Amino acid sequence: MIEYRIATNDDIELLMSSRLEMLRVVNGLSNDYVFSDEIVRESREYFLHGDQLTVLVLDGSEVIGCASMSFMWIMPTFSHPTGRRAHLMNVYTRNEYRRQGIARKMVEMLIDATWAKGATEISLDATVMGRPLYESLGFKNSTECMVLAK
């Protein structure tokens, strides 16, 4: 039976295993790829103490999907009076479970929880494969953002 739930700190091992699996798949890495201590340490710290929500999807005891929402608090503006914004990240469903509405349900759960937390905007970086899902949920392209990377 498929179970959807918002993860808690008690789920840290499931969160970490799903995160590392997602990173391997998305980046085309082998199953035995060893991540840097920094990535593992910082991911664990973020799941335990970061301002985030993650949905886990389980089939029995096995994680088959995950999606995270990261929250930011910036100076309030007229269009964002709470200053609360969010960024949707790492929406992942195992290959054999795709095209069953799992990603949609995870994202809908996170959207509902995000509005309930007072956020006024959700951003995301869409892959080509994910774009139709996000558009069907009402996401639009934005020209507001510029990025400076180190």
Segments and roles (model prediction):
Residues 97-109:
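Conserved acetyl-CoA pyrophosphate-binding loop and the N-cap/start of the following alpha-helix
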Residues 23-43:
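Conserved GNAT-fold acetyl-CoA-binding loop/helix
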Residues 73-88, 98:
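A conserved beta-turn-beta hairpin within the catalytic core of GNAT-like acetyltransferases
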Residues 3-17:
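A short beta-loop-alpha structural element at the N-terminal edge
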Residues 44-56, 87:
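A short helix-loop-beta-strand connector motif used in the catalytic cores of GNAT acetyltransferases and
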